[in-house]
């Protein structure tokens, strides 16, 4: 991609692999029998944390560039870690892995950096405890470090108070080991990478509206996984192409899962010029996305759209500053409990840039 003050942004680019799918490929590949081959793996610190945690539990994982080969241990083949499982800054690793650890035949301690040790874990501790898990907060504050003693689990139906793919996935992963059916209902549909990957690995998973239902698994089968580019990373280039004068850029092989494509919907709501050519390839749906400089207009973003773009709200707020009229973002409270309070950070940062914003709620 080329940038010039005279010609704007021009050209094509490829972005790194999807973070959510990368995490899940490590976890399910580790629990499968046989080899799982992953292409397009995201080499970010969070995904490496997932990889290292499962290595600590005896899984052999070969890593070369964006290719990962996982030598699965089977559903019941994980070994007790010799050290504390350090998730770094990864909330996804913490919450999803806890669902797996709750059913193992060993004890484990899960810790992360200072940010992780402030993030709320009661949202997974409650449903796991209802399933029979022994999971406690070491400091008694419902945050990491977490102490988990594996126990036999039983299936439950859980009405989640939040639309969170991490909470849902934690429960579904525990459900693989539970006695009986496990189901989760959310207020809105959250991203469904776990459900799609469950299906690919041969797990009995069904969805109906905002409910996901899993039956206990006997065996998972190693797979070949092709990971598309992360739409959350693409969002920054999409925004740049829309607001930079005289621009036209194409972003290759971007994941357009319909539980993650909220940014594309917002661009259309704001009047942006965007097209995408769907790709015919294995794995989750993907496309080459092209955007051009556009005159944007304000819009209202709320409700069921929020879980589809929760990680893209900071860049959407930037787009809104270049749009004609007011943009309102509602129902975004989840941003307050990320690695930082993203709402406050956005409000303060944009004030320093003299951009007109009020705090989002």
Which sequence ranges carry the predicted segments?
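Conserved loop->alpha-helix
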Residues: 54, 259-274
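Structural motif
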Residues: 1-43, 71-116, 147-188, 213-256, ...
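N-terminal cofactor/phosphate-binding cores enriched in small/glycine residues
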Residues: 46, 50
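A glycine-rich helix N-cap at a beta->alpha junction
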Residues: 132-137
